[in-house]
Amino acid sequence: MQDFWQAAAAQLERELTPQQFKTWIKPLAPVAFDEETHALRIAAPNRFKLDWVKSQFSGRITALACEYWEAQVSVQFVLDPAASGRAAAYMQPAQPGMGPGGMDGHAAPGTGMGGYPGAQPMGGQAMGQPPFAMPGQQPGYGYGEPVSAAGYGMGQPPYGNPGNPGNPAGMPSAAPVPAGARGQPHPGQHGHQPHGADMGEIDVVQMDPAEASARSYRAPPQQPQQQPHQQMGGATPMPGHQPSDTVHERSRLNPILTFDNFVTGKANQLARAAAIQVANNPGKSYNPLYLYGGVGLGKTHLIHAIGNFMLLENPRARIRYIHAEQYVSDVVKAYQRKAFDEFKRYYHSLDLLLIDDIQFFSGKNRTQEEFFYAFEALIANRAQVIITSDTYPKEISGIDDRLISRFDSGLTVAIEPPELEMRVAILMKKAAAENVNVPEEVAFFVAKHLRSNVRELEGALRKILAFSNFHGKDITIEVTREALKDLLTVQNRQISVENIQKTCADFYNIKVADMYSKKRPANIARPRQIAMYLAKELTQKSLPEIGELFGGRDHTTVLHAVRKIADERSKDAQLNHELHVLEQTLKG
């Protein structure tokens, strides 16, 4: 059994990133193998790791076991808090020739399962806590929101059982915590044992070899981005510190959304740098951090990544992610139950508050008042506050001026729509995660036609993959064009050069007639060049046709304008934002 686990671990170490191997595979320990029933039992140290290993790696481990023992093997995952300690012993070199692998039941010297080299010793030290990294099966790629509604905490208030007679509002009785005491457990949490953590409890996953082979297992990228403390010089998490099995449920953080799977480009590099700085220095720099941008651009991904990193650094930290609508709902419930004292104690004692889409507070005066008090208390206690919105603070209507001034008091960072190269990179990564080879020219074709947000890109990719599978065709530009014909038709529908000229003239406050005139002042020539660029990008008109519609200009003039604006768009975030607004307006 030790030979098998060393060989399996060696193979998985080659397939996974170092952080993922240390986080998910190294803490596991084989418990027993029944030679009669071919049942293998593997222990995980806590429910959190058990659930993730079972959901992400059980198929691969089962396949390796079947290959090693040359039989149908079922894998049973056992919950055992002492597993991490025993795992180190199983990583020690084994005696040669003690495991199966041939007709005589002995492995060939120096070989492991499937003929690959036997495992080398990996050290006998107990596992420390590596940087937080989830298996890469559902990456967020820098853009996109939580993969499940549960990440928003909708319908799940942050406090306890409303039916508790000793606590009518169902809220905890935590008192405000001074700055010096942050990171201590909640009252009543000492000695807490996670549900289901009894020694010897078993969760069983059984698969035959066919199912194990059929079950998808996708190796993540081999060169992940570094964790924040590695980039910014923060301290490495202390050994033994790890999020408990219920900590993500309490915080409403989505563990899949991390810095590792956040794709960075010019459009979001400043926001990511600010997020990393905050993750390493919560409550000290950039407080509050205010991120704003359109839908599907990665705001929620970034704030979850901050929370997940801080949770790794200090699993006892009181962290709460909440959507603004749910915060409003919590205020209403507290009002109905006359439980504002408990409500305040909960929110005022957090170490990190992540609140999404703050624009939903518009017009809700009581909610704004309660949030103002919570904000003031958290800042006074040096807790970190992170806010997202779809617009700049001063542009939000229906929000109290004193709140707006608080939002502006920290760091405000915009996340812009991704540039062409970044959209291509996101599509290629998403395709790789699906184990599908998408030609680069196809990715460029899709990225060129779909610019609004990355959710739209991912939806288009799913349509292409489904169309290719259903029709048994390779993915080409022709197949892509056919798969996306409805989407592309909608993109180009009702967009005319005349409409583009009028929209640009209104946007830049010039006359439509200036689009055809020979005037060359900068305040006219620039909008005219932008309109030419959009006409080339959003219509099927040729360069000569566009030139004719702009006062009979030569096609070389149009080509110069298109190239000039395209080049400046890749370098100028403000221009990129303006073009994005114009494109969205034209597409309706």
From Swiss-Prot:
One example of a Gene Ontology biological process annotation: DNA replication initiation
Domain III, AAA+ region, as annotated region: 252-468
Keyword set, alphabetical order: ATP-binding, Cytoplasm, DNA replication, DNA-binding, Lipid-binding, Nucleotide-binding
Region (Domain I, interacts with DnaA modulators): 1-73
GO CC annotations on file: cytoplasm; plasma membrane
An example molecular function term from Gene Ontology annotations: DNA replication origin binding
Residues engaged in binding ATP: 296, 298-300
Region annotation Domain II: where it falls in the sequence: 73-251
Comp. bias regions, Low complexity: 118-140, 155-176, 183-196
UniProt-annotated location(s): Cytoplasm
Location of the region described as Domain IV, binds dsDNA in the Swiss-Prot/TrEMBL record: 469-588
Region described as Disordered: 104-141, 154-198, 212-247
Pfam family, one: Bac_DnaA_C
Keyword rRNA-binding on entry: no
SMART domains attached to this UniProt entry: AAA, Bac_DnaA_C
InterPro entries in alphabetical order: AAA+_ATPase, Chromosome_initiator_DnaA, Chromosome_initiator_DnaA-like, Chromosome_initiator_DnaA_CS, DnaA_C, DnaA_dom, DnaA_N_dom, DnaA_N_sf
Record family assignment: Belongs to the DnaA family.
Role of this protein: Plays an essential role in the initiation and regulation of chromosomal replication. ATP-DnaA binds to the origin of replication (oriC) to initiate formation of the DNA replication initiation complex once per cell cycle. Binds the DnaA box (a 9 base pair repeat at the origin) and separates the double-stranded (ds)DNA. Forms a right-handed helical filament on oriC DNA; dsDNA binds to the exterior of the filament while single-stranded (ss)DNA is stabiized in the filament's interior.
Domain comment quoted from the record: Domain I is involved in oligomerization and binding regulators, domain II is flexibile and of varying length in different bacteria, domain III forms the AAA+ region, while domain IV binds dsDNA.
Subunit structure comment from the entry: Oligomerizes as a right-handed, spiral filament on DNA at oriC.
Entry protein name: Chromosomal replication initiator protein DnaA
